[in-house]
Amino acid sequence: MTEEVWMGTWRPHRPRGPIMALYSSPGPKYLIPPTTGFMKHTPTKLRAPAYSFRGAPMLLAENCSPGPRYNVNPKILRTGKDLGPAYSILGRYQTKTMLTPGPGDYFPEKSTKYVFDSAPSHSISARTKAFRVDSTPGPAAYMLPMVMGPNTVGKASQPSFSIKGRSKLGGFSDDLHKTPGPAAYRQTDVRVTKFKAPQYTMAARVEPPGDKTLKPGPGAHSPEKVTLTKPCAPVVTFGIKHSDYMTPLLVDVE
């Protein structure tokens, strides 16, 4: 009997718990959404209309007026209180009899000029600081207008002449040899005034518009593999063995 050679540290052993991949359906640990109610309803089923039940509403009292605890004045109307003019009588204000002027507050000797005829009297005070007798402008404070030149005021002015430097043009020192020569003028094109021959412009070659994308060549096609228009033998496809731990595809959710 030959001994089996094991690779690594794994050895065949009994599973410690259930392997969830062996089950094709969800176990009890999954919370399946309910098919009744409104909250968390399963999206794979149609939800029927739901109705709520509640108690009967409270009936309103027949008499909604304020009770006898309110004392409403019958003289109060929507425009205010219906009353005639009323006056209030208060007590006399307290008079402070002790705050009276004494004998020293009066000057009866000064009342003669107001009661009897009196001579005019003058008062002598100190000199004011805001007014000075000698505050007149001096000779240098005036700016007399000019009496010479063209800008005189109130007088006729004589003609005035200005003296400036010598001009370089038109003078006796002007060099008449410094005149423009024939080359200083731009020559007029002959074709402006005479017959002009036709002119032609030669441009680059114009290429016709076309498709410059990459297209497949003869070796890119495989006509021997065409089975749509030609008869062919039956073809069998071999798949692979699916694992037992793979979850099956649920197509019909109903």
Curated annotation (Swiss-Prot):
Positions of STPGR repeats: 180-205, 216-241
Disulfide bond annotation, renumbered to this chain: none
GO biological process: cell differentiation; flagellated sperm motility; spermatogenesis
Region (Disordered): 207-226
Keywords, alphabetical: Cell projection, Cilium, Cytoplasm, Cytoskeleton, Developmental protein, Differentiation, Flagellum, Repeat, Spermatogenesis
Cellular location(s): Cytoplasm; Cytoplasm, Cytoskeleton, Flagellum axoneme
Location (main, coarse): cytoplasm
rRNA-binding keyword on record: no
Cellular-component GO terms for this entry: cytoplasm; cytoskeleton; outer dense fiber
PANTHER family: OUTER DENSE FIBER PROTEIN 3, SHIPPO-1-RELATED
Family per record: Belongs to the CIMAP family.
Misc. remarks from the entry: 'Shippo' is a Japanese word for tail.
Subunit description: Microtubule inner protein component of sperm flagellar doublet microtubules.
Function text: Outer dense fibers are filamentous structures located on the outside of the axoneme in the midpiece and principal piece of the mammalian sperm tail. May help to maintain the passive elastic structures and elastic recoil of the sperm tail.
Protein name: Ciliary microtubule associated protein 1A
Source organism: Homo sapiens (Human)
Gene from which this protein is expressed: CIMAP1A
